């Protein structure tokens, strides 16, 4: 067992590098967008036209990652127009994350300027103007209130990425400490906000209820972190960052396989707990159709994230690290 507090990961610390990724027990069914093929045809040209990725080699590597595949899993209930623009927002987010935030090129001041629509930065910089153009497109096919909520959650996601980049995660972290340090940077609170633009909104009484807030923050978000960390671990073994709980648990338990098994057990526990929260909400708000719709969407997003993450055709988890990510490997 590890006694020293470590702040960096070294794959060579483990003599036995063999491990089997566990098959998680998923209680819900996944869906897939019927517009995947059609929107895929235009997606490449749209990304290229944004000029968000300056190097041709980086552009080709990004397209190879097939992020639209994950988007097609996460947003299967959207009609074609909503899916087109939600997909564009998600592609934009992936690009900003990979090339502007994860390697610490940009910081909090840059993000705050990005979300000030009247700022000189937005008016003069295509990175800002593209984002607001996407939001306008979403408003045109969705509803204003839900898009305002989406803008807020997009901002919160970027804030979390920057905050986590500044955190000193160490090998003694409990899972709760780790999830608190990650905030919402895994992106699935943002993902849920994306689905809200085309479904009836929850009333404020439910949206602001302590049980609903607790369910999202302490169960829904950690479940996605567990999925992310288990299935992205292969890709992240080269990075010295401890930003994956498999790495932290491996140091604590002395084995990568024991760490994988531990996260699998945590996943089962959190799935059980979130189901209890669903039942509690349905008891507090009986026969509420909007709540039923939102809980169904939440279950579907979890199942879809899981199924895409385990799909060998999804290179973002099964492929090589992007050049932008390689820059931070030995920091």
UniProtKB/Swiss-Prot annotation:
Motif mapping: DDxx(x)D/E motif: 97-102
InterPro entries assigned: Isoprenoid_synthase_dom_sf (IPR008949)
Listed EC numbers: 4.2.3.-
One Pfam family matching this protein: Terpene_syn_C_2
GO molecular function: lyase activity; metal ion binding
Keywords: Lyase, Metal-binding
Motif mapping: NDxxSxxxD/E motif: 228-236
UniProt similarity note: Belongs to the terpene synthase family.
Annotated function: Terpene synthase that converts its substrate farnesyl diphosphate (FPP) into several yet unidentified sesquiterpenes.
Domain notes: Contains several highly conserved motifs that are important for catalytic activity including the aspartate-rich 'DDxx(x)D/E' motif and the 'NDxxSxxxD/E' motif, both of which are involved in complexing metal ions to coordinate the binding of the isoprenyl diphosphate substrate in the active site.
Protein name: Terpene synthase 8
Organism: Dictyostelium purpureum
